[in-house]
């Protein structure tokens, strides 16, 4: 029994190692930032790293579970839908998720002083979310010659 649990844990860690390591790195930056003075180089770095690694965790998790019709970066979608609304929601779940959570970050940012310690970090997260949304939309229509992910 003990060996089965260890094997299951090992498979879980292996199968989700990118998510786990990315989240661990993000958590490390948050812990370091909690103790840091944002007016120092290290403090400013930790705050920026939180926003950057939040975007990484978003990309890793969202692209694992969600879809974006027309994006070469997205997972393949299920083929058959009987309900048009459900089809739309699933087909664009990646964009809808990033927009919905982005609105949440914007609401939080608007309630914070942008010059305060966490106001600056949340502002950077809003910027990161905007960049991710832009890339999702860009990959639907734009190409980059020589990129294996691109259509051309």
Predicted regions and their residues:
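A structural feature that tracks compact, well-ordered secondary-structure segments
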Residues: 33-65, 72, 107-144, 148
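Alpha-helical transmembrane segments and their helix-start/interface "positive-inside/aromatic belt" motifs
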Residues: 5-23, 84-98
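N-terminal soluble segments of membrane proteins
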Residues: 1-14, 68-71, 144-147
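Short, structured coil/loop segments at alpha-helix boundaries
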Residues: 2, 6, 39-40, 83, ...
């Amino acid at each position: 029994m003990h060996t089965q649990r260890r094997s299951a844990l090992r498979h879980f860690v292996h199968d989700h190692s990118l998510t786990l390591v990315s989240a661990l790195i993000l958590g490390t930056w948050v812990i370091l930032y909690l103790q840091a003075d944002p007016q120092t180089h290290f403090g400013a770095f930790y705050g920026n790293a939180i926003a950057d690694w939040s975007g990484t965790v978003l990309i890793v998790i969202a692209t694992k579970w969600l879809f974006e019709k027309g994006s070469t970066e997205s997972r393949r979608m299920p083929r058959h839908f009987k309900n048009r609304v459900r089809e739309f929601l699933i087909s664009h779940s990646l964009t809808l998720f990033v927009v919905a959570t982005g609105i949440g970050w914007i609401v939080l940012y608007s309630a914070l002083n942008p010059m305060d310690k966490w106001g600056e970090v949340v502002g950077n997260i809003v910027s990161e979310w905007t960049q991710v949304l832009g890339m999702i939309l860009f990959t639907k229509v734009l190409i980059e010659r020589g990129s294996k992910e691109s259509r051309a």
